[in-house]
């Protein structure tokens, strides 16, 4: 997924490059003026990748290879500070003993204005010790899985912002723990200009309230003062589609076409074992049915809420899992007059 955003002339870093397949595709996308660096700890993989680099360059019509393979660990990368436009990785950080150190290394090597798009395995609950020390599960990228909450918190603590879900698919369920393959993107923001073109941000929806990674709260239809750093972040995807940025405060209500909302059906709901995990780029969000979602934390939801979160406006921000399987044959529940069912 990370390769879809590669721009010509960029410098791309692949953590855990193996035989170099992703690096060679990145080499084609960045063109002869770009660079690609692959990091791996395995001598055999490095040897294979280096042998193929010259052949790939020739096939691409380049006068010399623009790919370099270096031996190193993910938590101590042989890469200079602030030199990378895009960091990619595929199910490698999961295997690192200290993932937070890897996140800090990623931030160190990223350019201001750089980004990452990485795929990895995460879980919905903390992996218990008997699985952590299961050597087979470790090799299957399960024992080292962080919860989605801890993974995204670690990225934020390292300095990245705008961390959000690009893709998700179920991986395995073991002893009631749900493991997911996720692709996440985030940014090391560049220095904001001293002068801002926007001074206010008004949340359009579909959420009724949001809290961003800096702790700023936005309420739908109500202008919130912002600074140049806020503007820089809110102009990045996927924030931009949710906000109206203006030089003067703009207030609007549900009669305004800029207001967006997805309301639950006015009907009874059923409980079928579904849980929703907010997957960024916000740390907290509220919908129009009194649910408050916190990033990465499972919240049990009923069938009506599942239908809401599976709509086009909501689905990019959530992982939805079912802990009950096919064991539920629940009866419909009538929602409370003054609030939601769940």
What are these regions (language model features)?
Residues 75-86:
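A short acidic, Gly/Pro-enriched loop at the edge of an enzyme's catalytic core
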Residues 100-115:
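A short glycine-rich, Lys/Arg-flanked "PGG" loop and its adjoining helix->strand segment in the class I
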Residues 144-158:
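Short alpha-helix
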Residues 122-142:
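Short, glycine-/aromatic-enriched active-site segment of Class I SAM-dependent methyltransferases
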